[in-house]
Amino acid sequence: MRSVKLFGLAALGSLGAAAPAPSRVSDLTKRSSTCTFTAASQATESASGCSEIVLDNIEVPAGETLDLSDVDDGTTIVFEGTTTFGYKEWSGPLIRFGGKDITIKQNSGAVIDGEGSRWWDGEGTNGGKTKPKFMYAHSLEDSTITGLSIKNTPVQAISVQATNLYLIDITIDNSDGDDNGGHNTDGFDISESTGVYIRGATVKNQDDCIAINSGENIEFSGGTCSGGHGLSIGSVGGRDDNTVKNVTITDSTVTDSANGVRIKTVYDATGSVSQVTYSNIKLSGITDYGIVIEQDYENGSPTGTPTTGVPITDLTIDGVTGTVESDAVEVYILCGDGSCSDWTWEGVDITGGEKSSKCENVPSGASC
């Protein structure tokens, strides 16, 4: 609850007896800047005027969003204890952030628990139960999300549409979904963003660790990804914004996942992928592809027929090393005629699997 509000009423009640001393007014102003809420409705409706918001063991009612997208500029949001959500089949999101110069963090031991097993049915967003998206970091500018511990999201975890946003030391643990029907549990989905910097993330899931669908000036570094579909660009094409530019994915590990490094563009769509660098990526236990780059996606699946409308240019693959399973493909490149160019391919050493016989239009310098 917002205890500072009670203090304010008490102070007003004392006005009839005597005017408060200046120090008391200063005290009141200071106290009223920090607000502690124990209910989602309190936080959503009463956040204005709070320079710091503490979310104390919030239980968000079924079918509602913990909406903190309209807080004052410069607000700090702190998660305390365990944040949970009531069950309902709906599209979500369960949490929404927005604003300028916002800091989002948690106190020691806090966890945001989606209890995703209530929705998991092996189908993700492809059918079955309607599952809520977890967190929208949309319309954030010059902001930081740091140290959050997120567990068992129903489907995709963090959707990013932001400008100059730092996400530091985020843990997303959906490993319970490995044997319980978790699907489409992407870690970070980025679109329509400029300046997104994800550092020190740990993601255990059943889909992309990171998926960049559009945006520029994006960095993912020091990440640890396991159980999912790897470090992905795309699929690019078929959206309102279909440009990916100036992306660096570096100093990260991918283990026990379907893919290591993946770039996919949409069949017969338009757009562009340029100035992308993957460097110092360590792979192990990869089951499908160590590196996969293909221009043939349609309705979420590869067609085997590449098109040229989303060229992949100025790509650097540098120091991608490690092992794949014996029946996995080490490197697969499927490009349209002339639509992959100006690639730099250095220090790639992936072993343990098969060589592909189906690569097409591999650009000069790359190997398949």
UniProtKB/Swiss-Prot annotation:
Alphabetic keyword roster: Cell wall biogenesis/degradation, Disulfide bond, Glycoprotein, Glycosidase, Hydrolase, Repeat, Secreted, Signal, Zymogen
Any Pfam family the entry gives: Glyco_hydro_28
GO molecular function, one term: polygalacturonase activity
Record GO biological process: cell wall organization; pectin catabolic process
Signal peptide location: 1-18
E.C. designation(s): 3.2.1.15
Propeptide residue interval(s): 19-31
InterPro entries the record matches: Glyco_hydro_28, Glycosyl_hydrlase_28, PbH1, Pectin_lyas_fold, Pectin_lyase_fold/virulence
Gene3D superfamilies, alphabetized: Single-stranded right-handed beta-helix, Pectin lyase-like (2.160.20.10)
PROSITE patterns: POLYGALACTURONASE
Protein name: Probable endopolygalacturonase A
Organism from which the protein derives: Aspergillus fumigatus (strain ATCC MYA-4609 / CBS 101355 / FGSC A1100 / Af293)
